[in-house]
């Protein structure tokens, strides 16, 4: 069994450049259980990076400062990694909300975390007779942490203070995701087989319970327009939900083992799912078809072997902001960078005991967490998107597949816009 197809020479695949690492301090008496870094996340504005260090601790670090430290170390070795885009993002933050480092004790093992950001709201001329304990401003940045005891804690990122304690799940909160429209709607996925929808602008009111999973729910992700939610879990489950009606749209069939991670492309036209069956599938979520398959074991395993302990479980997947690159992390101690127009990785990086990965806000860096509670960072593949692809993304942000198919356009353009051709 091999990690790459026969037509690919592993030695010719480029190695991603490591730019830094954040190591969790340990003591000789510390137990290994509970040290896992189950999740890493970047703030939507690029101001913060957060990771679970294990043993109840979440670390919040200003990303620009962290990147400068990496750059300083790399410059000493003759490599310049200055990132102007992140620097500009952080310079826009007001002095009042200048990022500072926080260490948060969540009170229990942290399995998931997510950043949530509010947006400016239109001022209503009507008299508001509602009362809320918390009134979030237009520059609010929150961190949600999902715990082993089923609780969700909401923190103010700028102060590190606890704001809300959400209690309704009965098992581990395995994943969290905020609606990207600034509504501060939070969805949680749990081992209790449910997804729960919370309204943080209504003091964390639990709005809805989404039922349908027969086993653990591992991960959930909003589409960029917040209209659709994907949830994945044990038993090969991939579900799509309408977040206006809170109903299931469809189930996606194709995986042969537990599905543990999912993420939409920036234009919402594609959905990537990672499974223990050694595969990452890229779907068209609007019609439920598989467009691309990225294998991590060759020759491809049979359904019976893929459904068991095959040694190539894919643990995490992340979509870059360019809509072209995908990162995956598997049990063979490799991080892979894929391009959706190629069936093999364009770059790889060694990583032992990896559990999770996420692209930075601008896609220039990939972060990954490990069983030891550490976080590692790589420079991502350099690629200039074609004008055609940028136009496609602009169109797909406002039109789903069914709407595109109704356009009076040539077949070749239709296939390009629906990602059937690259």
UniProtKB/Swiss-Prot annotation:
Question: What pathway does this protein act in?
Answer: Protein modification; protein ubiquitination
Give the GO biological process terms. Answer: intracellular signal transduction; protein ubiquitination
Does Repeat count among this protein's keywords?
A: yes
Among its keywords, does the record have Heme? no
Q: Identify one Pfam family in the record.
A: WD40
Mind telling me which PROSITE patterns this protein's record contains? SOCS, WD_REPEATS_1, WD_REPEATS_2, WD_REPEATS_REGION
Task: Name the UniProt key words of this record, in alphabetical order.
Answer: Repeat, Ubl conjugation pathway, WD repeat
Concerning SMART domains, the annotation shows: SOCS, SOCS_box, WD40
Kindly indicate where the leader peptide sits in this chain: none
Say which domain of life the source belongs to. Answer: Eukaryota
Question: Which segments of the protein form a coiled coil according to its record?
Answer: none
Q: Describe the protein's quaternary organization and the partners it interacts with.
A: Component of a probable ECS E3 ubiquitin-protein ligase complex that contains the Elongin BC complex.
Main function: Probable substrate-recognition component of a SCF-like ECS (Elongin-Cullin-SOCS-box protein) E3 ubiquitin-protein ligase complex which mediates the ubiquitination and subsequent proteasomal degradation of target proteins.
What does the domain comment read?
The SOCS box domain mediates the interaction with the Elongin BC complex, an adapter module in different E3 ubiquitin ligase complexes.
Q: What is this protein called?
A: WD repeat and SOCS box-containing protein 1
Organism of this sequence: Xenopus tropicalis (Western clawed frog)
Q: Which gene encodes it?
A: wsb1
């Amino acid at each position: 069994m091999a990690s790459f197809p026969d037509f690919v020479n592993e030695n010719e695949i480029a190695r991603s450049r490591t730019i830094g690492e954040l190591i969790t301090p340990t003591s000789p008496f510390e137990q290994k259980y509970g040290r896992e870094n189950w999740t890493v996340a970047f703030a939507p504005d690029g101001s913060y990076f957060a990771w679970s260090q294990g043993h109840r601790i979440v670390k919040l670090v200003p990303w620009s400062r962290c990147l400068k430290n990496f750059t300083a170390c790399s410059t000493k070795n003759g490599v310049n990694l200055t990132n102007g885009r992140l620097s500009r993002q952080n310079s826009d933050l007001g002095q009042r909300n200048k990022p500072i480092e926080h260490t948060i004790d969540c009170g229990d093992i942290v399995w998931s975390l997510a950043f949530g950001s509010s947006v400016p709201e239109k001022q209503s001329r009507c008299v508001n007779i509602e009362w809320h304990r918390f009134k979030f401003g237009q520059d609010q940045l929150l961190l949600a942490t999902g715990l082993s005891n089923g609780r969700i804690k909401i923190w103010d990122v700028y102060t590190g203070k606890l704001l809300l304690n959400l209690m309704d799940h009965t098992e581990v909160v395995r994943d969290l995701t905020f609606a990207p429209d600034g509504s501060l709607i939070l969805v949680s996925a749990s081992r209790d087989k449910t997804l729960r929808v919370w309204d943080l602008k209504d003091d964390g009111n639990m709005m809805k319970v989404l039922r349908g999973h027969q086993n653990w729910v591992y991960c959930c992700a909003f589409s960029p327009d917040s209209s659709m939610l994907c949830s994945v879990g044990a038993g090969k489950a991939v579900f799509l939900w309408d977040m206006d009606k809170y109903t299931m749209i469809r189930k996606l069939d194709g995986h042969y083992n537990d599905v543990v991670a999912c993420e939409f492309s920036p234009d919402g036209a594609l959905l990537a799912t990672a499974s223990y069956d050694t595969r990452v599938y890229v779907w068209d979520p609007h019609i439920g078809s598989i467009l691309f398959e990225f294998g991590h074991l060759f020759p491809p395993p049979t359904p019976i072997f893929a459904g068991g302990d095959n040694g190539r479980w894919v643990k995490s997947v992340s979509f870059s902001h360019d809509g072209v690159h995908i990162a995956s992390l598997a049990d063979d101690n490799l991080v892979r960078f894929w391009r959706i127009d190629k069936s093999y990785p364009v770059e790889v990086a060694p990583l032992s005991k990896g559990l999770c990965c996420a692209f930075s806000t601008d896609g220039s860096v990939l972060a990954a967490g490990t069983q030891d509670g550490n976080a590692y960072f790589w420079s991502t593949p350099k690629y200039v998107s074609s004008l055609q692809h940028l136009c496609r993304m602009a169109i797909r942000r406002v039109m789903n597949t069914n709407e595109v198919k109704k356009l009076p356009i040539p077949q070749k353009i239709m296939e390009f816009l629906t990602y059937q051709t690259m």
